[in-house]
Amino acid sequence: MNLEERVQIAILNKYYGALLTNRQQSILSMYVDNNLSLAEVSDELGISRQAVKDAIDNSLLTLKQTEERLHFVGKDAKLKEIIKNKAPNQIDEATKLELIAYLED
């Protein structure tokens, strides 16, 4: 797993990690945040590598499907882009309406 994938998973986990079980959160954190291999996670938890892989795969599926439905990560990035391109005192009524409309989508 490359750095870009790890960052994307960390972002998804920040938004939707509460939807995972404590066990899934723990395994995903060990694998992604602590950069442990499947074997290292399995040794640490005393479970098979296949069980670790299944937990990671199921966790990632949950996180990705939730983003596909809710689009919170995408909307947040778009809002930050809109705001970044405006000086704080330049957010006029049209921009406010654009932001509100975007949030309501």
Locate predicted features.
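Short, Lys/Arg-enriched N-terminal segment that forms or immediately precedes the first helix
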Residues: E4-G17
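Short amphipathic alpha helix immediately N-terminal
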Residues: N22-N34
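Short alpha-helical "recognition helix" segments of helix-turn-helix
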Residues: E40-L45
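Helix-turn-helix DNA-binding motif, specifically the short coil turn and the N-cap/start of the second
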Residues: S48-R49
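Residues within the DNA-recognition helix of helix-turn-helix
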Residues: A55-N58
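C-terminal flanking helix
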Residues: L60-E67
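Short, basic, alpha-helical segments at the C-terminal edge of helix-turn-helix-like DNA-binding modules
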Residues: R69-E81
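Helix-turn-helix/homeodomain-like alpha-helical modules used for DNA recognition
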Residues: K80-D105
